[in-house]
Amino acid sequence: NVGTVQSEISKPSTTVPEQPSAPDDQPASGVSSGESSAPQDTETSKPQTASPAETVEVTEEPVINEDDAVTITNNGIAVVGTRALMLYGGSYSVGEQYAGVVNKFKEALGSDVNVYTMIIPTSCEFYNPESVKAYCGSQKDNIDYVYSMLKNTTGVDAYSALKKHVREDIYLRTDHHWAPLGAYYAAQAFAEAAGVPFKDISEYEQRVVHDYVGTMYGYTEDVVLKNNPEDFVYYVPKTVEYSTTYYDYILQDGKIVGANAPYNADFFIKFSDGNGMAYCTFMG
């Protein structure tokens, strides 16, 4: 039996943090008013254990144009050229809380269940130009720190798997999510760690929704993102058809006030070009 906990490492910032002053042995900081703060805990030192991603064999470096125009919004997003990056401001104390929750899962499930956790770095870890790096902490340092605190639980190294493919479309430019291809590489890393079968990507049919503009335009209203849509590429099994049960409901003041009867329909919904809901065509 396998228990899995997956986490993306940051969410949209809704508040403006004060500028931190981190010690030399902490992840980089230096965010001015309007950006997410980098890790700044001083009560916890960095782990001395070997980090999971130290053995990364980088096949390619990301293509970063240092001359691209950079705009930093007041909600912690940097628009670099035609790519939007959510600035990372995690902390070791939050990492400790997360590791504690995972350890409690393992304790509750017992020795008969293997528990895995896989923390996913966001795109700013790989695609920041030098002018933006000072505004972000190291996600790798924080991931390694979380994994060092796990007890009888396996931390899956998705970081290395993604870093090997940074010149491929593993993250979306106009959305805060990763792309389905990035999710595929991370899932492959999990399958290897768990020792479970995993199909080659050739077993899937590639589909494309053109002119996709994702959540980052909604967060920033930056016209550069709107005028530079991207292809949303996703993959569906060639030999298996999936359906799911849907519920439509009405929310009012955070409460469900109406719903219809459940109905079955295709899992992979076909959206037209330019439809911002295209991300719903896959589960990452």
Indicate where each model-derived feature is located.
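Extracellular glycan-modifying ectodomains
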Residues: 1-284
